[in-house]
Amino acid sequence: MSCPPVRVLPVSLAPAQSLGSKDDSLYLDRSGPLDPSKPPLPPPQSTMARGLPINPSFPTRPTSGYHFPLKTAMNPQPAKQGPVFGRQGRGTSARMVTKKPDEDIYLECEPDPVPVLTRSLSSKALIPPVPLPRTSGLPKSVAGYQEARNGAMDGALKAGRRLSASSIAPALSSSVAENGSLLGQPWYSGNCDRQSVERALLHFQKDGAYKVRLSSGPHSSQPFTLAVLLRGRVFNIPIRQLDGGHHYALGREGRNHEELFSSVAAMVQHYTKHPLPLVDGHSGNRGLTYLRFPTKP
C-alpha cells in the first residue's frame, strides 16, 4: 500500500514593516482621542537623551495626541506663550523667578541695610533742615518792626527777671538775718514743723502758751508763724514781712488797721503786755489772750 503524496502548503509571510509603520505610530503618535482612564505610556529610555530623539525616524514635532516637551527644551527664550510642562520647563521657570529685578535689589540690600538707609535718608531725615530766617519773605519795614518788637519784649522779660530777683533777694536776706537774731529767743524754734509745735502747746494745756516757727509754705512775704493756744485750740497766725524786711505785721492782708513792728522780737514783746485778739475761723468766736508762756517742743 503506497502512501499518499504530502502536499506542502504555501507559507505566506507578512511583509516587513519599517520603523515608521502603523505599529510604531500607535506607540509614538496617537492621533485619536486618549482614554481618560488610561494614562499614556512613557517613552522608551533608549530613544531619549536629554530630551532629544536619537532615532532619525522620530517625529520632529509632537502631534496633537502626544505631548512631548521637545520644542520647549530647544527654545531658550522665556516661556510667555502658556504653561510649560516637563522637567526642563520647570527649571526654566525657576531660573526666571530668581532673576526678577525687584528680588535682586532686595537680596543686595539685605546684608547691609544701614548704608542703604543712610544713602536714602541722609539728605532728609538724618540731617536736620536748616531753619530759614523769619524775615526772609517780608519787606524791610515789617522785618525791622518785628526785630524791634522782639528786642523790646526780650528786654522787658530780662528787666522783669532782674526786678523780681532784686525784690526777692533783700527779703530772703532780711529773713535769714532775722532768723539769726531769733535763735537765742526761748519762744523761737527754727527747726520744728507745725505738727510738733501744736503737740507741744496742747501738751502744755495753758491759755497764752505760744511759739514762733518758720512758715510751712514757701512764702517769702510770710517767713514766720505765731502759734498761740486758747481754750484748747491752737491758732496759727502768719507774720508778714513788709518793706523788704524793715517792718513786720501780724495777721493776713486786708485789715483796715494793723500795727507795724521793726522786728519779730518787738512784736512778741508788745503782745506780752497788750491783749491779742483771736477769731475762730470755723465758729466765728472771738477771744483775747496775752503771750504768757513761751513753750519749747
Swiss-Prot record:
- Please name one Pfam family that this protein belongs to: SH2
Q: Which SMART domains match?
A: SH2
Q: Which InterPro entries match?
A: Immunoreceptor_sig_adapters (IPR051751), SH2 (IPR000980), SH2_dom_sf (IPR036860)
List keywords of the entry alphabetically: SH2 domain
Region entry Disordered, spans:
1-61, 74-93
Q: Does the keyword Iron-sulfur apply?
A: no
Stretches of Pro residues bias are at 36-45
A cellular component term, taken from the record's GO annotations: cytoplasm
The segment(s) forming the SH2 domain are: 187-295
Mind telling me what this protein is named?
SH2 domain-containing protein 6
